[in-house]
């Protein structure tokens, strides 16, 4: 369930740049990536994958050091590739890392670690908003009640295998980054189903009734080929335009126009992967005005043209 890219939020810079030159507006000095860089970990590879997803491979070799994460503002999935046998999280003594072991670190978490010896690991960085939209689409859940669980050294063979695939992919070319993007979204879906929890003391106030949220979600999906307006959606919800705009954002995690735009891009991705339809027909089926409008919007969202995306997603 990709997020349409706006201005990228900088979690971590490419290896050839400095951290200070790439401090993001939403992720500040406490980001996991910056913390590791300040701890003299070696950033071997880094890439933006589109949809405000970032990926990195790190190496650390040290006798012993303490590393602390403090409300990084973004979620992190860590998968150990090699080593980590003597690294442990404080307050969970005696539980150590190992290849294919995973850690899920929510954006609002705090943790302190004793790092010892060699470790080689992959990080996938993503935003809380990735869970918000998936909660509605994949689980039909109230998005405000779910968040990523704080997990240390859990095992999930499916997620670990996907992380190994990500680590083995080159990230230099557009095709490879697109494939990495698809794998990353598969990882996020598995995390949502297996490593999400209800927010502690979650009090859900305001927003749309569950039945209204479902009715709007289904109506939008059934009418993506049309020009959907706020007035039309307000009639479906039996609310004024003013109240719908406010309540929609609360219950869907984004305003109506952004949700509709995301749905159009999602449908386009599916059609490009599964069919050989001409681009003009794909554009029409997804509600874009014309092929040019579709190509422009798709490139902004996916980081590649529709043709490049289709080529990357077509098995060799």
Regions found by a protein language model. Give the residues of each.
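Regular secondary-structure segments
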Residues: 160-171, 217, 221-224, 269-273
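Residue at a beta-strand N-cap/secondary-structure junction
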Residues: 227, 276-277
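Membrane-cytosol interface segments
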Residues: 2-49, 59-61
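N-terminal regulatory/effector-sensing and dimerization cores
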Residues: 33-144, 173, 177
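Short, Lys/Arg-enriched N-terminal segment that forms or immediately precedes the first helix
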Residues: 198-204, 250-252
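Amphipathic alpha-helical segments enriched in hydrophobic/aromatic residues interleaved with Lys/Arg
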Residues: 13, 139-201
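Basic/polar phosphate-binding segments, predominantly the helix-turn-helix DNA-binding elements
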Residues: 190, 194, 215-266, 283-308, ...
């Amino acid at each position: 369930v990709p997020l349409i890219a706006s201005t990228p939020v900088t979690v971590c810079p490419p290896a050839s740049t400095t951290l200070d030159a790439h401090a993001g507006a939403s992720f500040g000095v406490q980001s996991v990536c910056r913390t590791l860089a300040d701890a003299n970990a070696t950033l071997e590879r880094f890439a933006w994958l589109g949809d405000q997803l970032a990926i990195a491979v790190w190496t650390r070799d040290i006798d012993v050091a303490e590393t602390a994460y403090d409300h990084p503002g973004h979620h992190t999935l860590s998968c150990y590739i090699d080593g980590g046998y003597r690294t442990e999280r404080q307050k969970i003594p005696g539980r150590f890392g190992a290849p294919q072991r995973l850690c899920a670190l929510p954006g609002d978490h705090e943790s302190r670690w004793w790092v010892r010896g060699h470790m080689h690991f992959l990080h996938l960085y993503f935003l809380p908003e990735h869970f918000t939209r998936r909660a509605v689409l994949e689980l039909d859940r109230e998005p405000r009640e779910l968040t990523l669980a704080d997990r240390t050294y859990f095992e999930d063979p499916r997620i670990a295998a996907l992380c190994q695939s990500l680590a083995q992919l080159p990230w230099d070319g557009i095709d490879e980054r697109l494939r990495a993007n698809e794998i990353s979204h598969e990882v996020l879906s598995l995390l949502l189903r297996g490593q999400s929890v209800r927010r502690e003391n979650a009090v859900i106030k305001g927003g749309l009734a569950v039945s209204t949220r479902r009715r709007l979600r289904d109506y939008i999906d059934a009418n993506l080929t049309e020009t959907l307006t706020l007035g039309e959606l307000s009639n479906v919800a039996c609310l004024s335009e003013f109240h719908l705009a406010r309540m929609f954002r609360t219950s869907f995690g984004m305003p109506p126009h952004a949700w509709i735009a995301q749905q159009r891009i999602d449908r386009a991705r599916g059609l490009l992967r599964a069919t050989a339809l001409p681009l003009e027909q794909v554009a029409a089926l997804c509600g874009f005005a014309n092929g040019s409008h579709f190509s422009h919007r798709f490139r902004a969202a996916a980081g590649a043209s529709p043709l490049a995306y289709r080529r990357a997603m077509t098995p060799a």
